[in-house]
Curated annotation (Swiss-Prot):
Protein name (record): ATP synthase gamma chain
Protein family per UniProt: Belongs to the ATPase gamma chain family.
Lineage per the UniProt record: Bacteria, Bacillati, Actinomycetota, Actinomycetes, Micrococcales
Source species: Leifsonia xyli subsp. xyli (strain CTCB07)
Membrane-protein topology: Peripheral membrane protein
Keyword Membrane: yes
An example molecular function term from Gene Ontology annotations: proton-transporting ATP synthase activity, rotational mechanism
SUPFAM superfamilies reported for this sequence: ATP synthase (F1-ATPase), gamma subunit
Record keywords, A-Z: ATP synthesis, Cell membrane, CF(1), Hydrogen ion transport, Ion transport, Membrane, Transport
Length: 299
């Protein structure tokens, strides 16, 4: 009985220690998410504005630019997966990885070769464990993304897209990340980044509305050459920020659930320890009474 009581007390201490850790991680994530939410709110209007600008130029110029024109045959497609460097975030990483598997299966069914660009150690570990090849990987800044890394990713995407297919170039770019909706909801988002869908961000004009007349200096291709890299950089950076905010929200939610589970374990083991202690006391009293009866009988 005493050994069982010691086991329960050890488990209670262990649950208390675990609760301290999960509670601290919950508070850290809560403090970080405020900053990442502000960064998402600051970057999203610019990303939408640059998307509308590029879409408008491509739509109203009637010029076939390489980054906005659908190729006749798509042979290779890149999937850029945004994961985190650390775990303890519930289904945050598994959701984007599941979406990547679905998208890869769809692309392969269309006869396309799939190439992976990975962001975050969790995606890297997922592919390395399964011994699956990936082209590029970036790690280290997923909790607090910096624009320099977003620019590096965007440059790699553009370089692969503009490279000839015979030299290992790609014809299509897709990105998969968790979009921050609220503290309780983070949705996996699948977006085709290139070739750009020019309808995105441009509303259909009313039939009675006079269409805008654009003039481009020095010419349309030069304007698009300047705008599209900025567009890719802003979209990649916004996806990084959305992913970071979603990760902190998922971590806070997971750690809150872990703290609640620790509380429940403490309550359950405390009740079991009390029962064991009561049984031990009852047994001791019974032994004392039995011994006293034996002595009185002997006398």
């Amino acid at each position: 009985m005493g050994a069982q009581l010691r086991v329960y007390r050890q488990k209670i201490k262990s649950a208390h220690r675990t609760k301290k850790i999960t509670r601290a991680m919950e508070l850290i994530s809560a403090s970080r998410i405020q900053k990442e939410q502000a960064r998402v709110a600051a970057s999203s209007p610019y990303a939408r504005a640059i998307t509308r600008a590029v879409s408008a130029v491509a739509t109203y110029s009637n010029v076939g630019h390489v980054l906005t024109t659908e190729p006749e045959k798509i042979e290779r497609a890149v999937i850029v997966i945004f994961s985190s460097d650390r775990g303890l975030a519930g289904a945050f990483n598994s959701n984007v990885l599941k979406e990547s598997e679905k998208l890869a299966e769809l692309l392969r069914s269309q006869g396309k070769e799939v190439v992976y660009f990975l962001i975050g150690r969790k995606a890297q570990g997922y592919f390395s464990f399964r011994r699956r090849a990936f082209e590029r990987v970036w790690t280290g800044n997923t909790d607090a993304p910096e624009f320099e890394q977003a620019k590096e990713v965007a440059d790699a995407i553009l370089e692969s897209f503009l490279r000839d297919s015979a030299d290992g170039g790609v014809d299509e770019i897709h990105v998969i990340y968790n979009r921050f909706v609220s503290m309780l909801t983070q949705e996996p988002q699948v977006v085709r980044l290139l070739p750009m869908e020019v309808v995105e961000g441009v509303e259909e004009p009313d039939r009675t509305q006079v269409l805008p007349l654009y003039e481009f200096e020095p010419d349309v291709n030069t304007v698009l050459d300047s705008l599209l890299p900025v567009y890719i950089e802003s979209r990649i950076f916004n996806a990084m920020l959305q992913s970071a905010a979603s990760k902190h929200a998922a971590t806070q939610k997971a750690m809150k659930a872990a703290s609640d589970n620790a509380d429940k374990l403490i309550t359950d083991y405390t009740r079991l320890a009390n029962n064991a202690r009561q049984a031990e006391i009852t047994q001791q009293i019974s032994e004392i009474v039995g011994g006293a009866d034996a002595l009185s009988s002997a006398n």
